[in-house]
C-alpha cells in the first residue's frame, strides 16, 4: 500500500504527469489550432515543477520502497533539465509557426520527455532507471521525426529509434547480468554487497564486470559518447532545429547525471574497475568530437560533434570519482546548458528570404549585418573553446583539477590537448562572422524569445566569471550528497 507520505518526494513528477495528460486532452478538444496556448501552458507547468522541486529542500527522501530518491543532487539536476526544456519550448514556437508545422503534440512530447528525465535522475533502482529512460526515449523518437513530410527528419527519427532500441537492449542485458550475479537491482543493495556491509558480500567477478560494461555501453549511447556516437551527427542535422536544440541539452544533462548516480552509488566500491572504461570513453569522445568537427560545413553537424567533445570533458570529472569531480561535472553541465541554448538561438535565427540556412559560410559578415548576434555567438564560441576568463574555461578547469587530484595525469593532459584542437573550429566561426564579407543578410526581426535567450545566455556566461560562488556552492552541496563519508 502506498502511504501519502511516500508521495511527497514524487510530487513534481506526479504534477508533470497530470499536467501532460490534461494538456493532451486540451489540445484534442480545442477546435482551433492550440499549439501556442499549449506551449505557453507547458512552459508554466515546467516552471511550477521547478517550484515543487525546490520546495522539497535538500534532505534525502525516498519513495516506493527505495525505488525513487529525492535529494540535493536530484534537485540540482532536475533544475537544469527543467530550465533547458522550458527554453527549448520557448525557442521552438516561432520556428513551428514559420514552417507551418505547429501541432499541440510537440510541447506535450517535450513535457513527457522531461518527466522521463526527472524519473531517471531520481532512480534508485535499475527498474526505475529503465522506466524513466524509456519514457524519455519514446518521446524523443517521435520528436526526431516530428516534421514527417521532410525525408531528412524521417530518416533521423528512424535511425535514432533503431540504434536507441539496440542501446536499450544492451542496457537491459547488463541489468539482467547484474541481477543474476548479485541478486538485486537496488542501488543501495548493490552498494552494500560490494562494500562488504552484507551477510554475504561478493567480490566483483567476470559476470558483474560484464554487466557493468553493458550498462555503461547503454548509457554511453544516450549521451552520444564514443564509440556509441554514430547516431548524433545525422539526427542533429536531420531533426528540426528546435528539436536539435532540445536534444543537445536536456536529455544529455539528464543521462550524464544518471551516469553519475549509477557510478557513485551501486558501483562506488568498484571505482578501479569502471574508471578504466570511463577514461577510455572520455579520451575517445574528446578527440573524435574535436577532430571530426574541424571538417564540418553544416553548423548543426558541427554542434553534434562539439557536444560529443563536451561529453568527453564531463566524463573526465566522472572518472575522477570524487566529490570535486562530481562538483566539476555539475558546474560544467550548468555552463554547457547556457552556452548551447544561446548558440542554438543564433542558429534558429539564421534565415534568408524566409527559409532556414545551416551552412557555417552563411554566417559570413554577420558582424556587419547583425552586430549584436555576432557578439553573442563570439562570446559563446570563445566560452565553448575554454578561453579564460569566460565560464567555459572554468568548467574545464574544475574537471581537470579533479582528475589531477585523483592522479589521472595522462587523462588531464590529453583533455587539454583536445581542448586546444577544438579551439580551431570555434574560432573559425568567429573568423567567418568578423572577417568574411557578407553574402546575404539574415531576415529581421529575430524575434523576442530568441533575443531574450541570447541575452540571458551571454549574461550568464559573462557573469559567472565575476560571481561564481552561487553555482559553485550549490554544485558542491549537490555533489557531497553522493559521498556522505567525504562530505
From Swiss-Prot:
What domain of life does the native source organism fall in? Bacteria
Q: How does it sit in the membrane?
A: Multi-pass membrane protein
What are the transmembrane regions? 9-29, 38-58, 73-93, 108-128, 161-181, 208-228, 240-260, 277-297, 306-326, 328-348, 374-394, 408-430, 452-472
One Pfam family this chain carries? Proton_antipo_M
Is Transmembrane one of the keywords UniProt gives this record?
A: yes
Major site of localization recorded for this protein = membrane
GO CC annotation: what is one?
plasma membrane
**Reactions this protein catalyses:** a quinone + NADH + 5 H(+)(in) = a quinol + NAD(+) + 4 H(+)(out)
Q: Which GO terms describe its molecular function?
A: NADH dehydrogenase (ubiquinone) activity; NADH:ubiquinone reductase (non-electrogenic) activity; quinone binding
The entry's localization annotation reads: Cell inner membrane
The UniProt entry's GO biological process terms, in alphabetical order, are:
ATP synthesis coupled electron transport
Q: What is its EC number?
A: 7.1.1.-
Which keywords label this protein? Cell inner membrane, Cell membrane, Membrane, NAD, Quinone, Translocase, Transmembrane, Transmembrane helix, Transport, Ubiquinone
Function, as annotated, reads: NDH-1 shuttles electrons from NADH, via FMN and iron-sulfur (Fe-S) centers, to quinones in the respiratory chain. The immediate electron acceptor for the enzyme in this species is believed to be ubiquinone. Couples the redox reaction to proton translocation (for every two electrons transferred, four hydrogen ions are translocated across the cytoplasmic membrane), and thus conserves the redox energy in a proton gradient.
PANTHER family given in the database record: NADH DEHYDROGENASE
What binding partners and quaternary form does the record give? NDH-1 is composed of 14 different subunits. Subunits NuoA, H, J, K, L, M, N constitute the membrane sector of the complex.
Regarding protein family, the annotation reads: Belongs to the complex I subunit 2 family.
Task: Please report the name of this protein according to its UniProt entry.
Answer: NADH-quinone oxidoreductase subunit N
User: Organism, per UniProt?
Assistant: Paramagnetospirillum magneticum (strain ATCC 700264 / AMB-1)
The protein's gene is named: nuoN
Amino acid at each position: 500500500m502506498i502511504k501519502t507520505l511516500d508521495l511527497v518526494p514524487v510530487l513534481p513528477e506526479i504534477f508533470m504527469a497530470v499536467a501532460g495528460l490534461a494538456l493532451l486532452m486540451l489540445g484534442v478538444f480545442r477546435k482551433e489550432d492550440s499549439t501556442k496556448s499549449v506551449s505557453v501552458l507547458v512552459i508554466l507547468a515546467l516552471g511550477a515543477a521547478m517550484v515543487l522541486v525546490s520546495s522539497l529542500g535538500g534532505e534525502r527522501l525516498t519513495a516506493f520502497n527505495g525505488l525513487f530518491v529525492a535529494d540535493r543532487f536530484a534537485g540540482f539536476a532536475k533544475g537544469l533539465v527543467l530550465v533547458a526544456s522550458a527554453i527549448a519550448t520557448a525557442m521552438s514556437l516561432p520556428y513551428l509557426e514559420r514552417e507551418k508545422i505547429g501541432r499541440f503534440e510537440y510541447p506535450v512530447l517535450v513535457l513527457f520527455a522531461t518527466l522521463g528525465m526527472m524519473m531517471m535522475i531520481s532512480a534508485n533502482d535499475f527498474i526505475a532507471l529503465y522506466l524513466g529512460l524509456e519514457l524519455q526515449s519514446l518521446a524523443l523518437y517521435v520528436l526526431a521525426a516530428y516534421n514527417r513530410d521532410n525525408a531528412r527528419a524521417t530518416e533521423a527519427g528512424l535511425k535514432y529509434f533503431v540504434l536507441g532500441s539496440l542501446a536499450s537492449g544492451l542496457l537491459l542485458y547488463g541489468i539482467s547480468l547484474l541481477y543474476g550475479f548479485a541478486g538485486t537491482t537496488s542501488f543501495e543493495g548493490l552498494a552494500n554487497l560490494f562494500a562488504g556491509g552484507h551477510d554475504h558480500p561478493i567480490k566483483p567477478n567476470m559476470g558483474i564486470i560484464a554487466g557493468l560494461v553493458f550498462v555503461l555501453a547503454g548509457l554511453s549511447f544516450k549521451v552520444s559518447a564514443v564509440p556509441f556516437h554514430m547516431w548524433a551527427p545525422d539526427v542533429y542535422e536531420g531533426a528540426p532545429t528546435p528539436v536539435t536544440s532540445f536534444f543537445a541539452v536536456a536529455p544529455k544533462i539528464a543521462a550524464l547525471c544518471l551516469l553519475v548516480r549509477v557510478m557513485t552509488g551501486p558501483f562506488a566500491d568498484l571505482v578501479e574497475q569502471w574508471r578504466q572504461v570511463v577514461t577510455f570513453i572520455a579520451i575517445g569522445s574528446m578527440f573524435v568530437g574535436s577532430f571530426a568537427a574541424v571538417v564540418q560545413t553544416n553548423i548543426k553537424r558541427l554542434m553534434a560533434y562539439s557536444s560529443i567533445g563536451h561529453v568527453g570533458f564531463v566524463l573526465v570529472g566522472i572518472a575522477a570519482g570524487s566529490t570535486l569531480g562530481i562538483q566539476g561535472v555539475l558546474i560544467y553541465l550548468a555552463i554547457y546548458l547556457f552556452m548551447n541554448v544561446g548558440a542554438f538561438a543564433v542558429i534558429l535565427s539564421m534565415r534568408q528570404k524566409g527559409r532556414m540556412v545551416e551552412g557555417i559560410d552563411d554566417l559570413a559578415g554577420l558582424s556587419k549585418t547583425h552586430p549584436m548576434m555576432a557578439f553573442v555567438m563570439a562570446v559563446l564560441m570563445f566560452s565553448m573553446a575554454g578561453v579564460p576568463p569566460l565560464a567555459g574555461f572554468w568548467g574545464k578547469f574544475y574537471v581537470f583539477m579533479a582528475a589531477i587530484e585523483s592522479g589521472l595525469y595522462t587523462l588531464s593532459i590529453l583533455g587539454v590537448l583536445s581542448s586546444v584542437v577544438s579551439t580551431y573550429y570555434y574560432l573559425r566561426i568567429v573568423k567567418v562572422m568578423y572577417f568574411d564579407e557578407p553574402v546575404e543578410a539574415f531576415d529581421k526581426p529575430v524575434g523576442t524569445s530568441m533575443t531574450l535567450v541570447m541575452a540571458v545566455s551571454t549574461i550568464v556566461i559573462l557573469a559567472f566569471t565575476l560571481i561564481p560562488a552561487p553555482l559553485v556552492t550549490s554544485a558542491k552541496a549537490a555533489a557531497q550528497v553522493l559521498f556522505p563519508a567525504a562530505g
